[in-house]
Swiss-Prot record:
As part of AP-5, a probable fifth adaptor protein complex it may be involved in endosomal transport. It comes from Mus musculus (Mouse). Its main location: cytoplasm. It is a peripheral membrane protein. It is found in: Cytoplasm, Cytosol; Late endosome membrane; Lysosome membrane. Keywords: Cytoplasm, Endosome, Lysosome, Membrane, Protein transport, Transport. The gene is Ap5m1. Widely expressed, including in small intestine and testis. In small intestine, highly expressed in cytoplasm of villi epithelial cells and internal glands. In testis, selectively expressed in maturing sperm cells (at protein level). The lineage of its organism: Eukaryota, Metazoa, Chordata, Craniata, Vertebrata. This is AP-5 complex subunit mu-1. One of its GO terms (cellular component) is cytosol. Belongs to the adaptor complexes medium subunit family. PROSITE patterns: MHD. The keyword Iron does not apply.
Length: 490
């Protein structure tokens, strides 16, 4: 019960082609269904040019068509139903509904939900009656209250929008196109906004906006004079806007404190409508200076229904949040380790999680351990050759902690102890895992009072921040370490 295509063709005797296609509409989704239903008997809908020639030939409307054609003009081909089969590219397109009224040819191809050979009875094809009903509805719309060709041209220009209402995706809902026109006009008066492509529906309920800023810090510390430590901060601003209306407008401002690190390499979601040029041109490739844009960073947008990432950014912070040193060396059968951590004074001393993983690859199980920790607790996983230093939620007032110890390892078993291709010999690392709530390393925050909302109802606005470590490594300074950049030495 659907249509594959619809045409309006102006019959123009005396012209080279004999007519002009004034309007056509194809429905690709219905065409895929036709291919599946018809199987080996499927014939695709042709382009407008071949269809025009085939239809005019079948209707005997070509000026030079005077010869008798048995397959078209024979007694067995007398047509009483306005249903035709068109010869296109050596194949026959059937059924084609077509009739001529006032120099305008109305044509459509209905979907047949079965094989076309042998031809099924027309009465069993529900799309035939729908196609004919739509064509008659278009005829009534075009010539009702028509005074001249200008009126006809205006109504033809309205057909694409009307068919979206009356026959969406090829399924006829209302053959009275005047009803669709009235519906469009009433919507344009009461709701001039167009539904954005990324928004598939409308929200109904309590208005609320949630803003979450998550910064991730990566770090490589070597403890060597000839190799520079590296660190990188990347941030993501996630939003969830539950607002009523088709296109509610929201503006969120990200701000920095006086000593905050400017945001760079900003990438925004497609729903953002405009941006200050200074935001787009701020790049981490450029050398930082006092003239760098430091906000506020305003993002006007029309939110989608689901949670989305409003923007991503990077930043060049002056120092890593936790400075560390790791010394590991072998003395006979023993391994001596010394670890020191210092929390930078600018970092909030309130962790959700803070722990250091100290793996010993390519060795046997830990058989003996003597250690001294100035702070926190040490967990030993002997078979995994792993130490986990649980620092806890706060550093001490001095902001410095240390761990020293001596380890002895047993005989390495087969496929039991952890193996690593890089950590050979004394090449080793500590991996720091930490998370701080209500804090960002750049100082970036979303001011709840500066959020502008243009929608019905006053929303509840919530803002969250957190800093998370990712690939935060402290390498053994007493052994070689992998680097991906040149040494500082000439």
């Amino acid at each position: 019960m659907a249509l594959r295509a619809v045409w309006l063709i102006r019959h123009e005797p005396g012209t080279p082609l004999g007519g002009t296609v004034r309007f056509s509409r194809r429905y690709p989704t219905v065409e895929k269904r036709a291919k599946a239903f018809n199987g080996m008997t499927y014939v695709p809908v042709p382009e407008d040019g071949p269809f025009l020639r085939a239809l005019l030939f079948q209707l005997r409307l070509l000026d030079d068509d005077k010869d008798f054609m048995e397959r078209r003009d024979g007694c067995s081909r007398i047509n009483k139903t306005s249903i035709y089969g068109l010869s296109v590219g050596g194949e026959e397109l059937w059924p084609v509904i077509a009739f001529l009224r006032d120099s305008m040819i109305y044509a459509s191809v209905p979907l047949v939900e079965q094989a076309l050979s042998p031809r099924p009875p027309l009465i069993s094809i529900s799309g035939v009656s729908q196609g004919l009903e739509l064509l008659l509805g278009i005829q009534d719309f075009l010539y009702s209250s028509q005074k001249n060709d200008t009126d006809l041209h205006t109504k033809l220009s309205q057909l694409p929008d009307l068919l979206l209402q009356a026959c969406p995706l090829g399924t006829l809902l209302d053959a009275n196109l005047q009803n669709s026109l009235n519906s469009i006009n009433s919507v344009s008066v009461t709701q001039p906004q167009k539904q954005p492509a990324w928004k598939v529906g409308a929200y109904k309920g309590k208005a609320q906006i949630s803003i979450s800023i998550t910064e991730t810090v990566k770090c490589m510390q070597y403890g060597k004079q000839d190799i520079a430590d590296t660190w990188q901060v990347a941030g993501t601003v996630a939003c969830k806007c539950d607002l009523e209306g088709v296109m509610p407008a929201v503006t969120i401002s990200l701000s920095l404190p006086t000593n905050g690190s400017p945001l760079q390499d900003i990438i925004v979601h497609p729903c953002v409508t405009s941006l200050d040029s200074a935001i787009l041109t701020s790049s981490s490739i450029d050398t930082m200076d006092d003239s760098a844009f430091s906000g506020p960073y305003k993002f006007p947008f029309t939110p989608p229904l689901e949670s989305f990432n409003l923007c991503h950014y990077t930043s060049q912070v002056p120092v890593p949040p936790i400075l560390g040193s790791y010394h590991m060396k072998e003395e006979g059968v023993q391994l001596k380790v010394t670890v020191n951590f210092k929390l930078h004074e600018s970092v909030r001393n309130n962790f959700e999680v803070c722990e250091a993983h100290i793996p010993f690859y390519n060795r046997g199980p830990i058989t003996h351990l003597e250690y001294k920790a100035s702070f926190g607790q040490l967990e030993v996983f002997r078979e995994k050759s792993l130490l986990v230093w649980i620092i806890g939620q706060k550093f001490p007032k001095s902001m410095e902690i240390s761990l020293s110890g001596t380890l002895t390892f047993g005989v390495k078993g087969h496929n039991k102890q952890p193996f690593d291709h890089i950590c050979i010999g004394n090449t080793a690392y500590i991996k720091l895992n930490f998370r701080i709530a209500d804090y960002t390393l750049t100082g970036c925050y979303a001011d709840q009072h500066s959020v502008q909302v243009f929608a019905s109802g006053k929303p509840k606005i919530s803002a969250y921040r957190k800093l998370i470590s990712s690939d935060y490594y402290i390498w053994n300074s007493k052994a070689p370490a992998p680097v991906t950049y040149a040494s500082l030495l000439p």
